[in-house]
Swiss-Prot record:
Residues bound to ATP: 158-165
Gene Ontology cellular-component annotations: plasma membrane; proton-transporting ATP synthase complex
Membrane topology: Peripheral membrane protein
Subunit structure: F-type ATPases have 2 components, CF(1) - the catalytic core - and CF(0) - the membrane proton channel. CF(1) has five subunits: alpha(3), beta(3), gamma(1), delta(1), epsilon(1). CF(0) has three main subunits: a(1), b(2) and c(9-12). The alpha and beta chains form an alternating ring which encloses part of the gamma chain. CF(1) is attached to CF(0) by a central stalk formed by the gamma and epsilon chains, while a peripheral stalk is formed by the delta and b chains.
Family, as annotated: Belongs to the ATPase alpha/beta chains family.
Species this protein is from: Priestia megaterium (strain ATCC 12872 / QMB1551) (Bacillus megaterium)
Superkingdom field: Bacteria
SMART domains with a match to the protein in the record: AAA
Protein name per UniProt: ATP synthase subunit beta
Length: 473
């Protein structure tokens, strides 16, 4: 007998008591199917996931959808296995929820399709791949100063409204189209509108045919938001392990995964730790991140947007994520206020790949020179604010002049923002990026006005802008 009854309901957390000595294992999926017997009742189809054994044949579970209409005494059935989701080619071009149920308007998924459990072990050490190859994004500031690694983990950090989602959409646009391989997108606790926009953009561009999408958005209960990243990851792992593909895995937003965990943590009876987060924060993050990796068979390159609460990088949620990443792209509010987009902080963003062995001597030297110039400009800003430009030495004046040109040249227009800006987006190959910054630092364009460098792609566009401004080039 694998049936039990609901004994207690605390929002998204439900206690279930089983009789006859049966006890479902941790992570097992339990199902509640209730047909209404009167007009005042509602039909209930609900999946619960076992989180804790309380003793006395009772388990504490987390609901994967709304618990509205649930009452004590309802019958619950143990499925005998963890939540499993469809994997393989049937997922491409489709949109799913946390349980692997289709939420688009297309035909139902074939009942015979392979399904894999969302909980599994990370790959073994001996199977991991260690090669480093650069992934070109076409975004100058990223490719020059904090390049991404194929098969690596990349984090886009930023507070509210500085452009994380736009950046991740541009990366999907640039990389998914250039890369031509398979992509998986997991929308974790973000706006449904953004997911809808993304789906339609991908449909228009044709990328959707090679993409699987899973969503557990802001309006979903915390159980769904906590597990939806694992649903997407399970789909990506199949393409990596069974088909040997190089998969792109996008997550927007990994902070909401942590946030969902903290919402249910107190209800599950755990003592909160720093800033009210769950005490198991590092473990949960590790279990997810260690599975996102590249093996000798195939690779998963993951790009994760990470919300930084109140712009505080020492908050436990972003701080715990930092440790797992190969490259970080930090978005800075001050830059977005100056109208420099993407608002990537060139001094705070880091990458393991920025070394002469991986990017080459010239690229490395130019990147370091750009950072030194911007760092010196940052140091001089206090002097300029108090005494003005006239008090600087000629050498420092030149540094400031070039630094401002470099700062503006790090900005560019995005394809995904064309409908808002009316400007065409630009994709800049790494070689062109390095060439442009090299020429600026050599002083080749000192005579051109600063504004000519704003929101352009290649260095040739700067010259065209200057001509339009009536400057002798």
């Amino acid at each position: 007998m694998t049936k039990g009854r609901v004994t207690q309901i605390m929002g998204p957390v439900v206690d279930v008591k089983f009789d006859n000595g049966h006890l479902p294992a941790i992570y097992n999926a339990l199902k509640i199917s209730h047909k209404p017997s009167s007009a005042s009742e509602v039909a209930i189809e609900l999946t619960l996931e076992v989180a804790i054994h309380l003793g006395d044949n009772t388990v504490r579970t987390v609901a994967m959808s709304s618990t509205d209409g649930l009452v004590r005494g309802l019958e619950v059935e143990d499925t005998g296995a963890a939540i499993s989701v469809p994997v393989g080619d049937v997922t491409l071009g489709r949109v799913f929820n946390v349980l692997g149920e289709k939420i688009d308007l297309d035909a139902p998924i074939d009942a015979g399709a392979r399904r894999d459990p969302i909980h599994r072990q990370a790959p073994k050490f001996e199977n991991l791949s260690t090669q480093a190859e650069i992934l070109e994004t076409g975004i100058k500031v990223v490719d020059l100063l904090a390049p991404y690694i194929k098969g690596g983990k990349i984090g886009l950090f930023g507070g509210a409204g500085v452009g994380k989602t736009v950046l991740i959409q541009e990366l999907i646009n640039n990389i998914a189209q250039e890369h031509g391989g398979i992509s998986v997108f997991a929308g974790v606790g973000e706006r449904t509108r953004e997911g809808n926009d993304l789906y339609h953009e991908m449909t228009d561009s044709g990328v959707i045919k090679k993409t699987a999408m899973v969503f557990g958005q802001m309006n979903e209960p915390p159980g769904a938001r906590q597990r939806v990243a694992l649903t997407g990851l399970t789909m990506a792992e199949y393409f990596r392990d069974e088909q040997g593909q190089d998969v792109l895995f996008f997550i927007d937003n990994i902070f909401r995964f942590t946030q969902a965990g903290s919402e249910v943590s107190a209800l599950l009876g755990r003592m909160p730790s720093a800033v009210g987060y769950q005490p198991t924060l590092a473990t949960e993050m590790g279990q997810l991140q260690e599975r996102i990796t590249s093996t000798s068979v195939g690779s998963v390159t993951s790009i994760q947007a990470i919300y930084v609460p109140a712009d505080d990088y020492t908050d436990p949620a972003p701080a715990t994520t930092f440790a797992h990443l190969d490259a970080t792209t930090n978005l800075e509010r001050k830059l977005s206020e100056m109208g420099i987009y993407p608002a990537v902080d060139p001094l705070a963003s880091t990458s393991r790949a920025l070394s002469p062995e991986i990017v080459g001597e010239e690229h490395y030297a130019i990147a370091r020179q750009v950072q030194q110039t911007l760092q010196r400009y940052k140091e001089l800003q206090d002097i300029i604010a108090i005494l003005g430009m006239d008090e600087l030495s000629d050498e420092d004046k030149l540094v400031v002049q070039r630094a401002r040109r470099v700062q503006f040249f790090l900005s560019q227009n995005f394809h995904v923002a064309e409908q808002f800006t009316g400007q065409k987006g630009s994709y800049v190959p790494v070689k062109e990026t390095v060439k442009g910054f090299k020429e600026i630092l050599e002083g080749k364009y000192d005579h051109l006005p600063e504004d000519a460098f704003r929101l352009v792609g290649r260095i040739e566009e700067v010259i065209e802008n200057a001509k339009r401004m009536g400057v002798e080039v």
